[in-house]
Amino acid sequence: MTPFMTEDFLLDTEFARRLYHEYAKDQPIFDYHCHLPPQQIAEDYRFKNLYDIWLKGDHYKWRAMRTNGVAERLCTGDASDREKFDAWAATVPHTIGNPLYHWTHLELRRPFGITGKLLSPSTADEIWNQCNELLAQDNFSARGIMQQMNVKMVGTTDDPIDSLEHHAEIAKDGSFTIKVLPSWRPDKAFNIEQATFNDYMAKLGEVSDTDIRRFADLQTALTKRLDHFAAHGCKVSDHALDVVMFAEANEAELDSILARRLAGETLSEHEVAQFKTAVLVFLGAEYARRGWVQQYHIGALRNNNLRQFKLLGPDVGFDSINDRPMAEELSKLLSKQNEENLLPKTILYCLNPRDNEVLGTMIGNFQGEGMPGKMQFGSGWWFNDQKDGMERQMTQLAQLGLLSRFVGMLTDSRSFLSYTRHEYFRRILCQMIGRWVEAGEAPADINLLGEMVKNICFNNARDYFAIELN
């Protein structure tokens, strides 16, 4: 029987153990997409307690707690921090088989150094007190944890109207060497069907000093904000494409669509598709000219529980996987961006694992001469960010493309403790390749495969995003 979560966790062949310990383990972290609050990094935030750093804002944990029958006041409500932690500790033993069980104990190991102890009601007091004592130390501040985890770069997620003042503050601090760069997330300027669109256009117009009436005005406003982001080191965009749409329109049609929406009219689905297509094609060209990477996160079905949405708002654990087709529209969109050779480097993520092969084959249609891995099939996202999901994504990428050119893992997280997801990914990667070697499906060449692992863990992302590190 194999003990739980030793130093060789998941490494079930000798070759996998060598790959991980000699090549993967000590690679730095290039976390190119996350949702960490830049203000906390700028202020070097000190966490009040284990709840503050670990459970606050974590919709993965809330979903599990709700499934375990925990009252909402202990998830998002007015219960005390300790009450919420105790509710989580009581839920953890029920999460065996869920990635939360592995994540929880990896996060207790690093950075807290807690090994050989499982979180449960019987250990909750000891773990709460031990972690809180450590969180009071300087090296467990926001920056301290990032430095402990050997992070070299993080890309936060930022709205076009953001001032980016916290990124500027971080960049001016010569004592902190980790790159913290903004990522452009223009969903609110894109989702014309949303009730908040008109208010957002007013805010965008104000910060860009542009009166947005026609589509060209919107382009002007977005260009000014792109310049603002570029001045703060941005090299990455991110789009939530819950549904991929494609429909072309001329300038007069786009002007009419925008004007009628600003006047309060409801648009048809075709008109929404026309507007979204035009925005994505315009932005894609801007990204290409600037050498940016665009990311498309495709296929979320959001805010399913209307009663809870009205009570709690979005992003609190009531989203799931959509099953709408996307291949044809995505193909047309990428082809349109490519017509003028202005398709930027692109990472495609799908939430429905049914679509893995769709994306795995789609990227092969639009690769770029002289640019290894220009089009990427992104790592297992959200509900696929678990052992089977990551194995499926990497196996299918290997079968349909080049795994060796993969830009690897990202946390996509709001928590400073989530860097162990890179460790989890690396262990799974080494396990998978080790099994290939054991079965005679890959050569037992430690130098060849070791370099491949190092590249997937760090080097490929560093080179792909072309961000100069400190």
Swiss-Prot record:
Pathway: Carbohydrate metabolism; pentose and glucuronate interconversion
Family per record: Belongs to the metallo-dependent hydrolases superfamily. Uronate isomerase family.
HAMAP family in the cross-refs: UxaC
Keyword Isomerase part of the UniProt annotation: yes
Alphabetized PANTHER family for the sequence: URONATE ISOMERASE
UniProt-recorded name of the protein: Uronate isomerase
Matches recorded under InterPro entries: Metal_Hydrolase, Uronate_isomerase
Catalytic reactions of this protein: D-glucuronate = D-fructuronate; aldehydo-D-galacturonate = keto-D-tagaturonate
EC identifiers of the protein: 5.3.1.12
Origin species: Escherichia fergusonii (strain ATCC 35469 / DSM 13698 / CCUG 18766 / IAM 14443 / JCM 21226 / LMG 7866 / NBRC 102419 / NCTC 12128 / CDC 0568-73)
Record lineage: Bacteria, Pseudomonadati, Pseudomonadota, Gammaproteobacteria, Enterobacterales
Gene: uxaC
GO molecular function terms listed in the Swiss-Prot or TrEMBL record: glucuronate isomerase activity
Biological process according to GO: D-galacturonate catabolic process; D-glucuronate catabolic process
Keywords: Isomerase
